[in-house]
Amino acid sequence: MPIRFSKKSHRNVVRQTSGDGAAAKRSTRVRLRPHADWHKRNFLTSVLIPSLFIKRSGNHAPPQFPKIREGEICITWIGHASFLVQTHEVNILIDPIWSKWLKVIKRLKRPGFELHHLPAIDFVLVTHAHFDHLDRRTLRRVAADQPIAVPIGVGNLVHDLGFHIVHELDYWQTVELGPLKISLTPCHHWGARFLADSHRDFGGFVIAANGRTIFHCGDSAYFPGFKEIGDRYKIDIALLPIGAYEAPTGREVHMNPEEAVKAFLELRAETLIPMHYGTFRLGFEPLHEPPQRLLASARAHGIEEKVLVMTEGKPVVL
């Protein structure tokens, strides 16, 4: 049975503690200018409008969650960057989004299962404020007086949704909740949700639970910080983004599949699970291309057996 955290603290409290991440913030924010090879293309006519006429794929099916023993981790990919991570004690939900639209961007693949099929959620993590990671409509339905962790500056976007307490984390800071240790890590991205809120931070999460360690990267371009993350934590499972690398702005904000393999090697993790592809068309690359390129790169590096390409809604015990 999932544990239940104490509910004695006041609802909607935002706790903010500074870690040692100031230097990392200065070096990981993306620059506004496009990369040198960028060729301007029309995202509206090339991607957004054609996507409106693509039939939404994927099937909702009640998930068959297995019994989890001590020392095991069960991971279910919901779609995009959304994951359910389970131990024999705790259910953790990361970057949940069940919405059919990101404003004008159509969801092209359904979530692996309906939201009401979720088990009781003990803890929620949101990596940053972008609409494809922080979906207030979904979070409002998920919130049931449990804690949520977000980067510094993001708490005011979730504090009114029904969570018991909001933990705003700085880079390398850890919050302990029951059997969980949750740490925020740097990434190379940006955190603004609108035009005038670039103060919001962004990052990934390292989750230590049940004797295992999982790294959810959030959104990130490749950057040298992956090696430091691997030095600080012994990572078993790395959830790494592989899509939206042909960004319409030309900014280097997402890894391509080959860079994800490079990041995985520097993290020195045991298993690579790709994410952030196939759900929303956020870049110019074809929807089917990211996993194909990932597997080709993994074969070239002799690590194909370490890559686990998941199917939405199908739990996997590791």
Annotate each language-model stretch with its function.
Residues 90-92, 122-123, 180, 212-214, ...:
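Structural motif
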